[in-house]
Amino acid sequence: ASQNVMFIADVRTAKIADLVVTRDNSVADGAMANTLQVKVTDANGNTLAGQTVSVLADNSATTAPTVITEPDGMVEISVTSQTAGTSAVTASINNSSLSQSVKFIADVSTAQIAMLEVTQDNAVADGAMANTLQVKVTDAFGNALSGQTVSVLAGNGATVAPTVITEPDGTAEIPVTSQTAGVSAVTASINSSSQSRNVTFVADVRTAQIADLVVIKDGSEADGATANTLRARVTDAFGNALAGQTVSVLADNGATTAPTVITEPDGTVEISVTSQTAGTSAVTASINNSSQSRNVTFIADVRTAQIADLVVIKDGSEADGATANTLRA
């Protein structure tokens, strides 16, 4: 006669026999899961159903703290995360444990401009020296996104590459040049996300020049007090106004003027010239190797007209009512 006998797996020797990654590289959106399969057996390799396996995941990943094995001794572990990178998942039972790493990737579908900051400002407006900004692109959960194309615009005539590509840390440098002094708004955008920052370009004092010299008042009296006036304008090589520049001034034909004048914020300065000598005076304004000249005219002051001299040039004429003595005033 025959009888069947049954042997059961030894739960006292339950161990993690295997831990295998079955799905990897899920998006770090807190919803899509990486998965692993754990197998529990006894010391002799017999599968164990209904065993509680403890699970831990690092790097801020989320998983159920325990899972229960199926009749085949297997159970699936789901792991989600909002943090891109590697997470070590550990399954343990009794004193037995195994670990495997899974990887979460940043979500390119939610790419956004997380940061735009000025890293160098106040460059010279010479079309070569650059102001720089750094842009950072992340997903909705702040994970850096590499290889992303960021569109860039700059206002006020500044020049910038139309696009930049992010590095592995999600950042990219944006150089901006200009020949126009002043403020330029730089805007970086990706998808529907954008940020703007202002950078400032300054006029190039190294190329200061007399851009213009204009007579604004002429024909003053040569009384040493009433002035003819001119306006000088100083710019750099690209026509940007230069404030605070010292302009040297000369006036000939005995006219008097301050030897230097300082430009105002708009790059202009008024030059006053007086004289006690009627006639034309050439006024020259210069800075560096640049100069311009203009003529101003001083007129005699009729208000102070006087007999300067009276000289007899013919005397002793006959008293015939016709022959004249003459004088010159």
Question: What positions do the PLM features span?
Answer:
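The feature marks long extracellular or luminal low-complexity segments
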Residues: 1-328
